[in-house]
Amino acid sequence: MAKNGLVICILVITLLLDQTTSHTSRLKARKHSKRRVRDKDGDLKTQIEKLWTEVNALKEIQALQTVCLRGTKVHKKCYLASEGLKHFHEANEDCISKGGILVIPRNSDEINALQDYGKRSLPGVNDFWLGINDMVTEGKFVDVNGIAISFLNWDRAQPNGGKRENCVLFSQSAQGKWSDEACRSSKRYICEFTIPQ
């Protein structure tokens, strides 16, 4: 009888151990399943963020293409002529509000393209603002982002305005040569938009 009781006790202990092991395995499986769900949730959030980034980039490209249709495309830039006269700072702010900057020619090809575009889109206009100035340090010309200008296309005897004339004009009558001018003068201008690659 004691032997039967011992056998029954061993069977009950074995069943309890088996159930405990089975329960522990199920708990581990649930934890693993929760971790996989959490990981997938993180992956989905990352994918959604990437999609939003792509959607916003496509919106920018579409807006830029609209600008390019109204203006002209040169190399990896689009140019868009202004409607009215503004002083240098207002012109730059207007270009920024449209997603661009005041035009900055970086080589002779861009000078030629600007001259052609300026004649077509700003008929009768002798000069327009460039995104170049020496407001911070006299004689050190930088673009509107503060980067030093390496390509220069000054007209004869220019720059000549000293501290009174810190902003730069593109002169149609001087075949695209530059001159310095008082930044408070009201002039036409051309905005430049970089085409994403």
Curated annotation (Swiss-Prot):
One of its GO terms (molecular function) is carbohydrate binding. InterPro entries: C-type_lectin-like (IPR001304), C-type_lectin-like/link_sf (IPR016186), C-type_lectin_CS (IPR018378), CLec_Tetranectin-domain (IPR051663), CTDL_fold (IPR016187). GO terms for cellular component: extracellular space. Residues 1-22 form the signal peptide. Coiled coil: none annotated. The keyword Protein biosynthesis does not apply. It is found in: Secreted. Restricted to cartilage and breast. Also expressed in breast cancers. SMART domains: CLECT. Keywords: Disulfide bond, Lectin, Secreted, Signal. One of its GO terms (biological process) is ossification. Disulfide bonds join 68-78, 95-191, 167-183. Residues 74-192 form the C-type lectin domain. Promotes cell adhesion to laminin-332 and fibronectin. This is C-type lectin domain family 3 member A. It comes from Homo sapiens (Human). The gene is CLEC3A.
